[in-house]
Amino acid sequence: MAAANAPIAMREALTLTSLGIAPQFVTFTHVTMESEKYICVRETSPQNSVVIVDMAMPAQPLRRPITADSALMNPNTRILALKAQIPGTTQDHLQIFNIEAKTKIKSHQMPEQVVFWKWITPKLLGLVTQTSVYHWSIEGDSEPAKMFDRTANLANNQIINYRCDPSEKWLVLIGIAPGAPERPQLVKGNMQLFSVDQQRSQALEAHAASFASFKVVGNENPSTLICFASKTTNAGQITSKLHVIELGAQPGKPGFSKKQADLFFPPDFQDDFPVAMQISQKYGLIYVITKLGLLFVYDLETAAAVYRNRISPDPIFLTAESSASGGFYAINRRGQVLHATVNDATIVPFVSSQLNNLELAVNLAKRANLPGAENLVVQRFQELFAQTKYKEAAELAAESPQGLLRTPDTVAKFQSVPVQAGQTPPLLQYFGTLLTRGKLNAYESLELSRLVVNQNKKNLLENWLAEDKLECSEELGDLVKTVDNDLALKIYIKARATPKVVAAFAERREFDKILIYSKQVGYTPDYLFLLQTILRTDPQGAVNFALMMSQMEGGCPVDYNTITDLFLQRNMIREATAFLLDVLKPNLPEHAFLQTKVLEINLVTYPNVADAILANGMFSHYDRPRVAQLCEKAGLYLRALQHYTELPDIKRVMVNTHAIEPQALVEFFGTLSREWALECMKDLLLVNLRGNLQIVVQAAKEYSEQLGVDACIKLFEQFKSYEGLYFFLGAYLSSSEDPDIHFKYIEAAARTGQIKEVERVTRESNFYDAEKTKNFLMEAKLPDARPLINVCDRFGFVPDLTHYLYTNNMLRYIEGYVQKVNPGNAPLVVGQLLDDECPEDFIKGLILSVRSLLPVEPLVDECEKRNRLRLLTQFLEHLVSEGSQDVHVHNALGKIIIDSNNNPEHFLTTNPFYDSRVVGKYCEKRDPTLAVVAYRRGQCDDELINVTNKNSLFKLQARYVVERMDGDLWDKVLQPENEYRRQLIDQVVSTALPESKSPEQVSAAVKAFMTADLPHELIELLEKIVLQNSAFSGNFNLQNLLILTAIKADPSRVMDYVNRLDNFDGPAVGEVAVEAQLFEEAFAIFKKFNLNVQAVNVLLDNIRSIERAEEFAFRVEEDAVWSQVAKAQLREGLVSEAIESFIRADDATHFLDVIRAAEEANVYDDLVKYLLMVRQKAREPKVDGELIFAYAKIDRLSDIEEFILMPNVANLQNVGDRLYDEELYEAAKIIYAFISNWAKLAVTLVKLKQFQGAVDAARKANSAKTWKEVCFACVDAEEFRLAQICGLNIIVQVDDLEEVSEYYQNRGCFNELISLMESGLGLERAHMGIFTELGVLYARYRPEKLMEHIKLFSTRLNIPKLIRACDEQQHWKELTYLYIQYDEFDNAATTIMNHSPDAWDHMQFKDVAVKVANVELYYKAVHFYLQEHPDLINDLLNVLALRLDHTRVVDIMRKAGQLHLVKPYMVAVQSNNVSAVNESLNELYVEEEDYERLRESVDMHDNFDQIGLAQKLEKHELLEMRRIAAYIYKKAGRWKQSIALSKKDNMYKDCMETCSQSGDRELSEDLLVYFIEQGKKECFASCLFICYDLIRADVALELAWMNNMVDFAFPYLLQFIREYTSKVDELVKDRIESQNEVRAKEKEEKDLVAQQNMYAQLLPLALPAPPGMGGPPPPMGMPGMPPMGGMGMPPMGPGPMPAYGMPPMGSY
């Protein structure tokens, strides 16, 4: 088939390699395509990058350096998702980026690896791990949410797709896995379907799947469908299916019935499988794409096959839906991006002609609005109409492709149908069907509206218009205007009938809408006339209209000044102002005149409005001097100030402060220059200082930065206004850091009596001059001293303050300051009072009044400096009595006691609160021993050491150091730099330590000597303590320390100390001696303490004398010692000696090392003795196993047999395997036989060439592996009988059959192999593989048995495998039989035709032909029979009649010149009314002069060239042939030619019937004249009745009267008069009923008017309408137009109809 005529159009969109992408990156793992918008390619060389191909601009790929394991572009937007594995983990890091915004949207770290991911919606990512499936939304901050766990059937599968339905309620996961062992090339497909609502999964077998929505007839809600394709093997049979199933059936609603269809794979594609499925919602088609490039197209609704073809020579690995085109994109391994879509022009003709599926063709055309089914649709419509199935016809017309039947003719056809009583008119059925399907066109909308308006159902129109069901037109608006103006306006607007819209708005007085609408549609009305019209009735509406005009694009169509004058002419000041204010908002220079104008008219009439306009500041181009004068006259002084520009004018107006808002005046000062502002302020103060001071102060505060603070201060000082200065500086003070400003403010506040403010500023301010302020306050002598107290307290003038207050007798303030303000400064106050010689009683009282709040230390210092410390005795004692623990209190009291020498030792030793360091320092020069007491009490180490060194008090120092037991203190006094160290050590050794009874003090001293690294002094010390009989002579630790110190400092003394001392830690000291390499001393220590193992270890490990160790072991005779000796001997390689020592030690713990060493030394005899000893100690499998192995090595097989019969824990299996590996087969045989390991025993017997025994053992083992090993060994040894026994047990296993067959065949044992397989057929477990393999062997080596075999066992064969074998061996008959059995009818037919001498059989071929799927094979079969078996061709054609394109068959036979050969076939299929068949048969009938058959053919089948046949027949010599020609002319509507031909042959009856059927009055009357001319009176009478409806009565009567044939015309006249009178009676009756209805309606209207007039007095009087705008709207009809009446439609009810044909014959 030519590509242009194919139903599916293919094109290459682009090639990835042409964009610079290397071929190695065109793979499933590197390329992703989530939609038709983007392709994303991940490159890893020469550098890591991601290439994004925008399908709208494929030549401009975007390449970004990104490292990732996978990259996905969002289906709709430029959002990129990246996945990368975290190094060293199995976790994946996911990120989502917005490429356009260059921002990261979100990221997440998955705890497990994501093996597949996909955008399932534009907002949702599907993540598939090894165990579960997650959904991750790109919106918000949510993490991936788990949806479900993967089912078991998807374990170890490669996931290739994941999808969800549009509602996200159904999810499907697709994976593939390696094929079954018998057919590994055919990949398995597995599917998991999950329901979100039910939280359940279903596992299915499928390679590809997709979701679809489909509307089932009778259900308004769409059904969710799942489609999936699978290719599976079952018992060697391959099944390829497509399934369409509804998910979640809707209760109570019609459901979608399950569909399935076969996928027919060509022979060369048997291992091909589906990799993708896409569904076109646009066309309702399913696309199934396979790996090798096959495309299957199926109908979604019926699952009917539409098309199959190969679209790519290279494997396809990726597809994506193309929703815009209704097709899909596919990418193959070559890098081609292929685009497939439906060929709109050819698919419907293809389905109707090639597939002969007319119903599907019509459904496709209706579904997707496609061409090609016009004739079918029209024909079907006519059939339905003829069958009065009006509802079905209406539905067909509504769904007709491309609106084929949506024409006025169709409407007229429905209108013409008579309406039966009680039934819905067909026309309304038609319109109702159209409304449910969509929108009506203009003609349909108009006709439906006529019906609705006539029935007064306006609400239906409103609903349809709201739902956009009607197409609006001007005619429709005119129709609706008769009942509803508002609705008509909406229709006019939608129909863009601009003049009608403007007229309607004008009638409604919605003038603003006129402007909006005119602008939208580009229409220009008369604006000035409209504005004048609105002004008369609606001033505000006129303003709005004018404003809308001003906002029009291109400027206002009427001048602003003209519009303003129109308002002012009618004294509409406010309206003119409103208009001008709005249009003058842009504040343009060209509007200066209008700005001045609006201000003038309002300053004269409405000053407040003018003031508001000026306040808004919206104008800046008006005449300011003119406006200033008008403002002053109107009393708007502030506005006048703002507009005057001369200083005199400003001064003149400004003094009117009574009429100016103070705040506004202050703001006005901000517009003046500095000099003018100061002049105006001065004038204001001159005119009214008291009244204007507040305004001047406010202005000065507001604009102090511009005017200058100094200038303002000078202004107020000039008028001596301290009040003004106070208020001005008060506002400026918080932001100023100028000391002078702060001082002036304090001064002004003091002058104005603001004492509290002075107190506040002196307390809070940090910027005034303290000295200057203090002097001012002292000079001012304010009654309140608190400001002075603040200054002096804050700035350290406390003595001056105290002196001022004391000299001014303000003692109350002194007490207040000390007690309340700052008690901390009381010492300074006391010191100044002492300097001022204040009485001590006042000072003591002042001190006692503060008590604990008083800081003692500075007070003591102040008194101590003045030698008045005793003054505080009472105060200090008072504090102590109150329980004070203040160190300063007790220090001062101690100093007083020391100075008075009042038992100071008692105070120093008993008082816990004084500071030892302070008091000790105070005592150093007075009495050093008191200082030592103080320092000892406070542990003041440094001070005590210094004072004792300085005064040579080393004995006290030594005692203190020993008693302190402080390591840091010892370190300090024992430092080499200490010049007094020797004196201290002497006192410690001679006095301090001998006096001490505390072990801790001794220990601390010893530790200090060790830390100071004084070993000799330490030995001296320890010898004195330990060796001389002291309290510590037997001290364990000291003896240890003495020996250890000697080891370190003087090793020669160690052996003496070891012999003299007994109470020391022998093991520990011995280890230290070993570390110090004093091995003999260590040996002596261990020996002294009976530590024999440690002692022998010293001999072995340190002294390295095995002989001394062995002697020592004999002496002590301990097992542990012998064990150490044995281990040493083992290390030295003395294996036999070591084994003997281990036996002496009775030590079985090191048997592993002994076994390893014995095996290396090959001393199995000694090992046996050792292992027997070990077995007495331990029950270890290793020991028993090694014992057996040792017996085997020394060939003691009988011992092995005895041993295994005894209780043992040996792992005999492992032992046997080891013996087998070491080729000790006899021993292994004993073990395997004992443990009944028949499999190993069989193999072992094979090694020993004992085949019969091996077979017996294999039988007991019953293992496939064992059987194979024994079998192959028997084959190699040519023991075929035994080999067959084994083989029969192997071939029942499918997986092992092929291996056995190959083994036999490789060694040329064909007969034996066939014998084996034949024997296998009778086995109970015989399977398909045995039968198949035997068939293959027959095909190769015994072809004469092949056919019998496949016929006997056809159901138990793997037919595809046998097909390949027969094809290879060219067994065509058998091959054909196999194809038939496998339902591969295409291949069977091809084989029969290609190898007919061997394979053809007519009955068989007929059976095959009807099942062939490839249409081309039908015609190949026709050619085949035509060439080889022409006598049987009709039989074949009759069988294939339903599948053939009859036109093509006829063409084949016509070209071959054998049409007559297939006449029976053509007769059989003529019922299909195919043009080629009809013409061929007609041709044969003419040729055979068979007019009866020809007439029957012409009458029943009209699809042929009628005129051509008629022209051919009208000259035929046979009359019947010419009658047929006339008949054809009549059917074709060529009435004159038909009549002329009938006249010529005197066939008058035919003439009359032709006239009657033509409906042509002229022809009928001409025929009457012809009969009169020919004198055929009887024919004249017959013609009158046959053409009754066409002949006018006057014509008939005239012709009869003139030609004396009235008698022959009389029956016609009687019938005519009877019918005429009946019609008149009916009309009279209808007229009377109509008049009665009119009278009743008039009466109802009168009653209604009377009822309405009851409330007439409540209605307001009607207002007179302006000229041209009043009165009812003019009628829409044109003058002279007759009334429309019933809108040109006949009445819908049934009416009398004329009789057709002959009238009834009345009695004469």
Curated annotation (Swiss-Prot):
Residues 537-648 are annotated as: Distal segment. Residues 653-1708 are annotated as: Proximal segment. SUPFAM superfamilies: ARM repeat, Clathrin heavy-chain terminal domain. Residues 1-492 are annotated as: Globular terminal domain. It is found in: Cytoplasmic vesicle membrane; Membrane, Coated pit. Residues 68-113 are annotated as: WD40-like repeat 2. Residues 1564-1708 are annotated as: Trimerization. It is a peripheral membrane protein. GO terms for biological process: intracellular protein transport; receptor-mediated endocytosis. Residues 206-270 are annotated as: WD40-like repeat 5. Residues 315-343 are annotated as: WD40-like repeat 7. GO terms for cellular component: clathrin coat of coated pit; clathrin coat of trans-Golgi network vesicle; clathrin complex. It holds the Pfam family Clathrin_propel. PROSITE patterns: CHCR. Gene3D superfamilies: 1.25.40.730, Clathrin heavy-chain terminal domain, Tetratricopeptide repeat domain. Residues 1227-1536 are annotated as: Involved in binding clathrin light chain. Keywords: Coated pit, Cytoplasmic vesicle, Membrane, Repeat. Residues 537-1708 are annotated as: Heavy chain arm. GO terms for molecular function: clathrin light chain binding; structural molecule activity. Residues 462-478 are annotated as: Binding site for the uncoating ATPase, involved in lattice disassembly. The C-terminal third of the heavy chains forms the hub of the triskelion. This region contains the trimerization domain and the light-chain binding domain involved in the assembly of the clathrin lattice. The N-terminal seven-bladed beta-propeller is formed by WD40-like repeats, and projects inward from the polyhedral outer clathrin coat. It constitutes a major protein-protein interaction node. Belongs to the clathrin heavy chain family. Clathrin triskelions, composed of 3 heavy chains and 3 light chains, are the basic subunits of the clathrin coat. Clathrin is the major protein of the polyhedral coat of coated pits and vesicles. This is Clathrin heavy chain 2. It comes from Oryza sativa subsp. japonica.
